[in-house]
Regions:
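Core catalytic lobe of class I
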Residues: 3-181
Length: 181
């Protein structure tokens, strides 16, 4: 096994190494959230992980209700979803405030979003983070006769302004005024 480096930060252990070798040694996870290389650039480090090997390594770490969230972009995300259709459930679309791909701006649109594909076998714990919306006026009542608003009994009420999240989420990026490399 090739663990290159291990650090504990804020009570969490971060391991730098080959995930295909390290994951099977770690036990069960409550969730897996990862941003693997997509294989979409010419960078030496940007080689897509072999999906069959990845799912094989994950098999020892996840249970049927363990959510696996994998960040990606096209065409990587399509191939990723197709690699495990049985467990694929849905995508989140991360609307990014800062687009990327400026070198290709004259050839194709800037990339202003990232795909987060969600996989699991059984429904895991889901606690939706409600968002604030507009309070809507609704009619509540039992008797309603209308030929364009003839006799109506009941009352108007306002629904909550809390809304369930949709599949497009926006988070600000951690942009720094200066970067250190």
């Amino acid at each position: 096994m090739s663990i290159i480096r291990k650090e504990v930060i804020g009570g969490q252990t971060l391991i730098l190494g080959d995930c295909l070798e390290v994951m099977p040694t770690l036990g069960r996870f409550d969730a897996v959230v990862t941003d693997p290389p997509y294989g979409t650039t010419q960078c030496a480090w940007d080689a897509a992980i072999p999906f069959a090997a990845m799912w094989g390594a994950l098999a020892s770490c996840i249970g049927p209700d363990t959510p696996v969230l994998l960040f990606g972009s096209e065409p990587f995300s399509t191939l990723l979803r197709a690699s495990n259709l049985r467990r694929f459930k849905y995508d989140w679309i991360w609307d990014k405030p800062k687009a990327t791909g400026f070198l290709n701006a004259k050839k194709q649109p800037l990339r202003g979003h990232e795909i987060i594909s969600v996989f699991y076998e059984r429904q895991p714990l889901y606690q939706p983070q409600m968002t604030k919306g507009v309070r809507k006026q609704t009619f509540r009542g039992k008797h309603l006769q209308t030929d364009v608003y003839g006799e109506m009994r009941g009352d108007y009420a306002y629904d909550s302004d809390q809304r369930y999240p949709n599949s497009v989420i926006t988070f600000s990026s951690d942009t720094q005024n200066s970067c250190y490399h």
